[in-house]
Amino acid sequence: MISFEDFLLRPSKVVDPFNRFVAKIDPFLTLVEFCQVIGPKPLAVVSQRPDDKIRGVDINDMAIWLMSSDTVPGTMIVLENNQTGVYAAAYYFNLYDMRARAFQRNLCIAYLCSEKPTKETLNLFSSAMKKLVSPVLICNRRLFIRHVTDIVKFSDSVDETTLKQYYTLNGDSQKLSDGSRFNVVFEQTRLLKSKFLTKRFQEMAFDDDICCGHNAENMNEAEDIICSFRVPSIPLSPVETLTPCAYSSIIPKLRQLCSELCSSGSPNRNSTHGALFCGHRPIATTSPAATTTLPWNTDSGKSDNDKNGEETLKEVTGHLGDVIFPLLCGEDLVVCGAEQRKSTVEDMLGKLSRVVPRESARNVEENIKIEKDPNRIGNGLGGLLCNRNETGKLARWRNVLDMNRSALKTFTYDGSLLAGLNKKRKFPSDRSLVLFIIAYLTNICQLAFICRYMFIKSPNSIEKALGDQQKLSSDDERILINLLMGIDFEKFNQLKVSSKDGAKPSRTINL
């Protein structure tokens, strides 16, 4: 499918002779199963229209397209159908069934739309899938273990000699093979029991656990499952019988998720048409003509700590580039301080979080919690309460802003993009300094856009893309790559270099 951006920015690309511009479809969610008898088939469709009707797309063709991808259960991928112009964010998982091939039945939940899903949409879909599928999987695993345990117990009660005599006295040649077939089933079932009955599986639990446990023994059902192997033509059980406790909650959750995804992907939502944001302000937009619907609030760089008289950011104006460089290149940075300096640490965290480029304007308002346990600190920017003599807690971080000693532990920055932030300047307040940093990063994003469009002609390196116009150091290249990943993660993720590759020795800067 040819986009308008291809005509404007990529004139060297061959124009599609079939002119495959397609009509826009309404976004919808679908649950698809790869049936071992008839192939991919849709089990449920959820949309915003009455009766969940879908226009402009063949749901059966979409089911075949979704299940044709080579994936691993538990993964999410983004697909693009060039013929129909449909994008899909698909999450794949499997349910265990005693009668299925390899005891597994593959399923997929996908969100289909005409526009490429944004990062906000993908994050929402990914987090929702984990919450939605977890109770389904745990119920299915417990029921499957119940069947395996009952079948093993049933097989132990069957005397092999008696079984052979029974089929030997019977003259039907078809039944002579049932004994060996049952033995194969019993052997495979015992292997499954040793595989699943582990301590890790027994301790598996989720917050939204609605499964009854399936602890009651049911030998009649186990006998029916064993007898069903004699007739291979018997159809498989419906999917809802494989997870009886949680299947009824799938459709209501999908309906709620569909409305959330449609609102997050709507162009009239309360966010802005941008790719990267600092303090509610777009520093990089997806197209030059894109405008923002978010009001330019003059208090966007103002934090709650400003009212308390905290002006911590002004004290490090001579090393601002060294402070924010780890965050701009995707590294972790920990701001630490003692209990007496907790307000200072909170103020520094709040202001640094407003100058870190983010993929969504909503994420700017998220407050970063200060932890006492270093193991609870996540990736990116974090806060830690520790005394001056507890330096052992900071050993695993390469970048530490120590408010106790007014020192910065980091690796040497060798570049020119942030040179303007390492000059000693005077600002009337931290708020004005935050706005200055946002404007400074906006100019850097303009260079990132040049790299984005010239990367098409020279996809091996950003330095080659720029040619002789401007020489970039490896540190500046890391900054631009991280900004490009924020603009388009799928296209520029391949350029990311591991932090362990070419790691430089750290140094301590007295602020």
Swiss-Prot record:
Provenance organism: Caenorhabditis elegans
Region annotation (Disordered) ranges: 288-310
Lineage: superkingdom: Eukaryota
One of the protein's GO biological processes: autophagy
Alphabetized InterPro entries for the sequence: FLCN/SMCR8_DENN
Keyword set, alphabetical order: Autophagy, Cytoplasm, Guanine-nucleotide releasing factor
GO cellular component: cytoplasm; guanyl-nucleotide exchange factor complex
Record-stated family: Belongs to the SMCR8 family.
Name of protein: Guanine nucleotide exchange protein smcr-8
UniProt keyword Cytoplasm, yes or no: yes
Cellular location(s): Cytoplasm
Gene Ontology molecular function terms on file: guanyl-nucleotide exchange factor activity
Job description of the protein: Part of a complex that has guanine nucleotide exchange factor (GEF) activity and regulates autophagy.
Limits of the uDENN FLCN/SMCR8-type domain: 20-168
Location, primary (coarse class): cytoplasm
Residue ranges annotated for the dDENN FLCN/SMCR8-type domain, each copy included: 434-488
Bias (Basic and acidic residues): 301-310
Ranges of residues in domain cDENN FLCN/SMCR8-type: 282-425
